[in-house]
Curated annotation (Swiss-Prot):
Residues linked to a glycan: 10
Any matching Pfam family: Cys_knot
Family per similarity comment: Belongs to the glycoprotein hormones subunit beta family.
Name of this protein: Gonadotropin subunit beta-2
Purpose of the protein: Involved in gametogenesis and steroidogenesis.
Transmembrane stretches, start-end: none
Organism: Thunnus obesus (Bigeye tuna)
One GO molecular-function entry: hormone activity
GO cellular component annotations of the record: cytoplasm; extracellular space
Gene: cgbb
InterPro entries assigned: Cystine-knot_cytokine, Glyco_hormone_CN, Gonadotropin_bsu, Gonadotropin_bsu_CS
GO biological process terms, semicolon-separated: G protein-coupled receptor signaling pathway; ovulation
Disulphide linkage map: 6-54, 20-69, 23-107, 31-85, 35-87, 90-97
Length: 115
């Protein structure tokens, strides 16, 4: 079994904005795949060990206008489009570095709220 290497893939992601009724799927490119990591057997206190993740090398932001926002709510949202990927430290400002992240097509608007 061979894991796919860190590479660009096409992905449908959901974009949404607080105040707008629903989320909308958009096509983009993201970074996905396996990076070789090492975990030292002997742990040295206070030493920094970084796990490499598949993350953006180059990207730009694309703008999408949500069609169902009420008056007074700015309907524009931006989302990243990956141009190239590499294995490196996780950049918290551009990547989801959590252990179990939400799926790219997850929508907060789909969660029922109970009052």
């Amino acid at each position: 079994f061979q894991l796919p290497p860190c590479q660009l893939i096409n992905q449908t992601v959901s974009v949404e904005k607080e105040g707008c009724a629903s989320c909308h799927p958009v096509e983009t490119t993201i970074c996905s795949g396996h990076c070789i990591t090492k975990d030292p057997v002997i742990k040295i206190p206070f030493s920094k060990v970084y796990q490499h993740v598949c993350t953006y090398r180059d990207f730009y932001y694309k703008t999408f206008e949500l069609p169902d926002c009420p008056p007074g709510v700015d309907p524009t949202v931006t989302y990243p489009v990956a141009l190239s990927c590499h294995c490196g430290r996780c950049a918290m400002d551009t990547s989801d570095c959590t252990f179990e992240s939400l799926q790219p097509d997850f929508c907060m608007n789909d969660i029922p709220f109970y009052y």
